[in-house]
Curated annotation (Swiss-Prot):
Coiled coil: none annotated. This is Putative hydro-lyase Xaut_1503. It comes from the Bacteria. Keywords: Lyase. Belongs to the D-glutamate cyclase family. GO terms for molecular function: lyase activity.
């Protein structure tokens, strides 16, 4: 799949100050005022990735997520045809409340859009999948710097050679997000993120990116490149963009996903998903 590193323009720093509550973020998406990444917005609240598939594939995809809980932890699911997921928020519309979407046909992206109302069908089932942006607040609270947040860009994401556990028509390579950290911070990040298994949990890989098929850290498959300094390690977490890699392999007749880095900000608090 071609790189999408330039798909979205990063917001200015004052954008983050404007969107401190989940509803404010969703309303900005709904109105078209927000079309960029959501990292750092509405601190303390869970963010989610999106995969929307026809009802005939929903059970199969749910089984795939069950087999692959690290990259695909389902935190909410709609009824067929419904664009509401009440467990994640009452004033919430799956069709409009992400800053950006991708529309897929037969495994190919046919549209990038800020609103999928015109594409919605009565047979569609929406899956909201936990996102690592949710645990970033906990990392920053411990003083761990996150370069993509500091620079107002999307976290870099890579299609690795790590294979997901297949389920029916769904199989493929796992996508991982990467954050550069000095060794002491990497150790602390492992300790912190272990508490959040429903938003990907602890890292799956640290250092030596070539062992998971990442040849160039400055050329992410999704998101934006950030440099890794000589005293830092690349730390990789399972990523909720994995369904997009899998959809490209499975080639369903129709699907909708979020644009990488452009998440749903829910009304659920990060602390609700912590286990320790």
């Amino acid at each position: 799949m071609a790189s999408t590193a330039s798909l979205r323009v990063a917001p200015q720093a004052d954008t983050y100050a404007a969107y401190q509550t989940p509803l404010a973020v969703r309303q900005a998406c709904r109105s078209g005022a927000l079309t960029g990444p959501t990292a750092g917005m509405a601190p303390g609240y869970v963010q989610g990735n999106l995969a929307v598939l026809p009802k005939e594939l929903a059970e199969e995809f749910l089984r795939f997520c069950h087999f692959n809980p690290r990259p695909c932890p389902v935190i909410g699911m709609s009824e067929p045809g419904s664009f509401k997921v009440p467990v994640l928020g009452e004033d919430l519309d799956i069709r409009t409340d992400f800053p950006g979407y991708r529309v897929w046909q037969d495994g190919e992206v046919i549209a990038d859009t800020a609103d999928v109302t015109d594409y919605w069908r009565d047979d569609l089932v929406a899956f909201v999948i936990g996102c690592s942006l949710s645990f970033e607040e906990a990392l920053m609270a411990e003083g761990l710097p996150l370069r993509h947040v500091d620079r107002n860009v999307r976290v870099p994401m890579f299609r690795t050679t790590v294979q997901c556990v297949p389920a029916g028509r769904f199989s493929g390579r796992m996508v991982m997000s990467m954050r550069p950290l000095v060794p002491a911070h990497a150790i602390r990040a492992i300790q912190i993120t272990t508490r959040f298994p429903q938003v990907h949990g602890a890292p799956l890989h640290v250092g030596l990116p070539e062992l998971i098929g990442v040849k160039d850290l400055m050329k992410p498959d999704y998101g934006d490149a950030v440099e890794v300094l000589d005293n830092e390690l690349p730390v990789f977490w399972a990523c909720g963009v994995t369904p997009q890699s899998v959809i490209a392999e499975a080639k369903p007749s129709f699907a909708i996903t979020h644009a990488p880095g452009c998440m749903l900000v829910t009304d659920r608090r990060n602390t609700e998903f912590a286990i320790l």
